Amino acid sequence: MPLTQPIPADTVDGTSAVLWRNRIQIPIHEPLIQKYIRFYQGEGRRTFSEAMEKGNNCLPRMTEILESQGVPAEMVSIVFVESRFEKNASYRGAGGYWQMMAGTARKMGLRVDRWVDERRDPIKSTKAAAKYLRTLHDHYDSWLLALAAYNAGDRPIGCVARKCCVKDGELYGRMLPARSAVYVSKVLAAMHLMREPEKYGFECPNYCKPTEFDPVLVNTPLQLEEVATWIDVPVGRLQELNPSLRLDAMLPGSGFALRLPPGSREKFDLAYEEHSRR
């Protein structure tokens, strides 16, 4: 096996102007949803604005990934509620943008170990979340129940689903456990505001063009500081491109897909060839 090899770059470009397709019917008059709409407009206004600004870098690509996997793009509102678009967010064992538990993340194909935590990668974690949400929707036949199940984790909501045929947009507050109803209401309230932020006094998002990179599969141990020196970029730039790396290093033989700044592959290959001879 070669020491390094090129791998295809992610094909999702995130440039679609239509991020919100309004596929989720929101029961907007539900008291609990209204409560959180008022909260985000008032006490939580600064938090909402800061989270949306932080999401400008990754939200377009996330929505494209969701749509490509058959999940409504608006489900990205989960990220707002779960992590405020903060990759290092962690709560009770859950981690990353989508706050997935390590076990669930691994089941969805993510790598989570001492060296790498792909829950912190906006592209890979969104693909895993889309797969998980799609599975939940296929089981419950409702995006509202899929939301509730996403939050419930191992706690069952199946009994609720069996007692009533839930259609998206129907009154749900009486059907879901209290904790799930609160969670779903937060997500739907955020979703509603994210559809028309200007209507509620928020600035129109200025979405950034998705970050480009040249991926290369590395099969030998490397430090990011070494690579940064080889290609003459700040190590912080490599950290930004490779958020899933926990220790700024690649485990030998792990086959890590290292992301390089565009145009730096040739420098990297020359330096790596020399490095491998030592």
At which residue positions do the language-model features occur?
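LysM (lysin motif) carbohydrate-binding repeats in extracellular/periplasmic proteins that recognize
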Residues: 223-252
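Substrate-binding/active-site groove segments that recognize
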Residues: 93-115, 126-128, 133, 157-160, ...
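Catalytic and binding regions of secreted/periplasmic enzymes and modules that target cell-wall glycans
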Residues: 133-160
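Primarily a LysM-type cell-wall glycan-binding module
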Residues: 205-232
